[in-house]
UniProtKB/Swiss-Prot annotation:
InterPro entries: Chaperonin_Cpn60_CS (IPR018370), Cpn60/GroEL (IPR001844), Cpn60/GroEL/TCP-1 (IPR002423), GroEL-like_apical_dom_sf (IPR027409), GROEL-like_equatorial_sf (IPR027413), TCP-1-like_intermed_sf (IPR027410)
Job description of the protein: Together with its co-chaperonin GroES, plays an essential role in assisting protein folding. The GroEL-GroES system forms a nano-cage that allows encapsulation of the non-native substrate proteins and provides a physical environment optimized to promote and accelerate protein folding.
Name of the protein: Chaperonin GroEL
Quaternary context: Forms a cylinder of 14 subunits composed of two heptameric rings stacked back-to-back. Interacts with the co-chaperonin GroES.
Gene that encodes the chain: groEL
Subcellular location per the Swiss-Prot or TrEMBL entry: Cytoplasm
UniProtKB keywords: ATP-binding, Chaperone, Cytoplasm, Isomerase, Nucleotide-binding
GO molecular function, one term: ATP-dependent protein folding chaperone
UniProt source species: Cronobacter sakazakii (strain ATCC BAA-894) (Enterobacter sakazakii)
A GO cellular-component term linked to this record: cytoplasm
């Protein structure tokens, strides 16, 4: 086992604080509308330019192992805030640095670290409740656009694009961000349920100008099996032909004689048919077939539950207003499924999301919810160069997370004002002893740090602005972009409650642990023995005299 280097008490805390400050100082230059960019060197390719706190934090590794431990613990704050709300990483880092700095001063002055931590925890619990009380719902497109704009570093086009996407696919819809091909940002919206399977034969195409199959008010047959024998399908085909409607077949596969017969029938105009493979594989395919069945009011024909294709009737088939199939995708628009059944299915999938352990599973389940509940929107980010594209894409993703958080828990006044108001309301809060009271004061003082940093980045004097904001009340604050005072919500400067809450909770959690640190242990650097061995070989030169 390698030898260890151990530091105690103030020596350990000073080193740890130095690491915290290096990381936090690098991250906090990005905060606010006048925050600056950070350039990150990559081992290959062009450097990355970013204004995203967590991206900066992830790149930082320090040479001194004790300092690095401090930096890594604050990096955890940024990562956790990012995982919980998708934004607010810089705010969380600034709060953590402020709590640690003030807390360690109190420890150096002889306060009990454990009581300090209890005081900080008590203040944060009370602050979270006050934040919830200040929160207002974020329901209209204007508010959503404002949240998106603020999070995308005051880029109004991004805010409007996200608001438009949310309006079109609903709050539950999936919105994804991709790299575009042009200079302009674009929004593509897919209404209804779309899955990545195209037609099984190009002979099904009935719109040659677009290369697509379009079926109006079709019946939809769902089969969890391979169909190769046409005899199994004859009863259903005859019933559909009598009804005079088109038919979409979604099955594990349609092949051989069955596919050939369907193609011939379609080309002769006897019955309008199209066939596609079911989406997904294994259990996921079964689940997605069931989703389509509920959306279209049909039944999955499956031998597992004793159903046979020959005995299927029109009652077993789903229906939709329209189906569009191209080479790679199938879109079912306006399924006739029962609304309460669809909501029940959505609730069931949400339960699975709660229990999912892997991010991949969670993402796939969320896609299924979106396909049932709304639709899918794709924001294609446009930029002149690849470096700008990456930076802009990261900003759009941040803005998207922030707007989702705003819809979920509402919004509070932005620009660090909400935390200042919360701190003002908690001045009467007390702990069980004097050390806990100091802990409460440490937390309340730290809540001013985001406002001060935003002002500092804008080139103004933080103390003057902080005092002016504290003298006001409600949503009165300082707009660093225009250098004006006023009502933050009226000026469109909003922060999602969830983002502010998460930043405060994660910052205080890690900062509290760091304040109570008394000893740090790390590996001693290893000496390079190979060099010593090589140097020792020099004596071999004397062997020449042995002759």
């Amino acid at each position: 086992m390698a030898a260890k280097d151990v530091k105690f008490g103030n020596d350990a805390r000073v080193k740890m604080l130095r690491g915290v400050n290096v990381l936090a100082d690098a991250v906090k230059v990005t905060l606010g509308p006048k925050g600056r960019n950070v350039v990150l060197d990559k081992s290959f390719g062009a450097p990355t330019i970013t204004k995203d706190g967590v991206s900066v934090a992830r790149e930082i590794e320090l040479e001194d192992k004790f300092e690095n431990m401090g930096a890594q613990m604050v990096k955890e704050v940024a990562s956790k805030a990012n995982d919980a709300a998708g934004d607010g990483t810089t705010t969380a880092t600034v709060l953590a640095q402020a709590i640690i700095t003030e807390g360690l001063k109190a420890v150096a002055a002889g306060m009990n670290p454990m009581d300090l931590k209890r005081g900080i925890d008590k203040a944060v619990v009370a602050a979270v409740e006050e934040l919830k009380a200040l929160s207002v719902p974020c329901s209209d497109s204007k508010a959503i656009a404002q949240v998106g704009t603020i999070s995308a570093n005051s880029d109004e086009t991004v805010g409007k694009l996200i608001a438009e996407a949310m309006e079109k696919v609903g709050k539950e819809g999936v919105i994804t961000v991709e790299e575009g091909t042009g200079l302009q940002d674009e929004l593509d919206v897919v209404e209804g349920m779309q899955f990545d399977r195209g037609y099984l034969s190009p002979y099904f195409i009935n719109k040659p100008e677009t290369g697509a199959v379009e079926l109006e008010s079709p019946f939809i047959l769902l089969a969890d099996k391979k169909i190769s024998n046409i005899r199994e399908m004859l009863p259903v085909l005859e019933a559909v032909a009598k009804a005079g409607k088109p038919l979409l077949i979604i099955a594990e596969d349609v092949e051989g004689e069955a596919l050939a017969t369907l193609v011939v029938n379609t080309m002769r105009g006897i019955v309008k048919v199209a066939a596609v493979k079911a989406p997904g594989f294994g259990d996921r395919r079964k689940a997605m077939l069931q989703d389509i069945a509920i959306l279209t009011g049909g039944t999955v024909i499956s031998e597992e539950i004793g159903m046979e294709l020959e005995k299927a009737t029109l009652e077993d088939l789903g229906q939709a207003k329209r189906v569009v199939i191209n080479k790679d995708t199938t879109t079912i628009i306006d399924g006739v499924g029962d609304e309460s059944a669809i909501q029940g299915r959505v609730g069931q999938i949400r339960q699975q999301i709660e229990e999912a352990t892997s991010d991949y599973d969670r993402e796939k389940l969320q896609e299924r919810v979106a396909k049932l509940a709304g639709g899918v929107a794709v924001i294609k980010v446009g930029a002149a160069t690849e470096v700008e594209m990456k930076e802009k894409k990261a900003r759009v993703e941040d803005a998207l997370h922030a707007t989702r958080a705003a819809v979920e828990e509402g919004v509070v006044a932005g620009g660090g004002v909400a935390l200042v108001r919360v701190a003002a309301k908690l001045t009467e809060l007390t702990g069980q002893n004097e050390d806990q009271n100091v802990g409460i004061k440490v937390a309340l003082r730290a809540m001013e740090a985001p406002l001060r940093q935003i002002v500092s980045n804008a080139g103004e004097e933080p103390s003057v602005v902080a005092n002016n904001v504290k003298a006001g009340d409600g949503n009165y604050g300082y707009n660093a972009a225009t250098e004006e005072y006023g009502n933050m919500i009226d000026m469109g400067i909003l922060d999602p409650t969830k983002v502010t809450r998460s930043a405060l909770q994660y910052a205080s959690s890690v900062a509290g642990l760091m304040i109570t640190t008394e000893c740090m242990v790390t590996d001693l650097p290893k000496e390079d023995k190979a060099d010593l061995g090589a140097a020792g070989m020099g004596g071999m030169g004397g062997m020449g005299g042995m002759m």
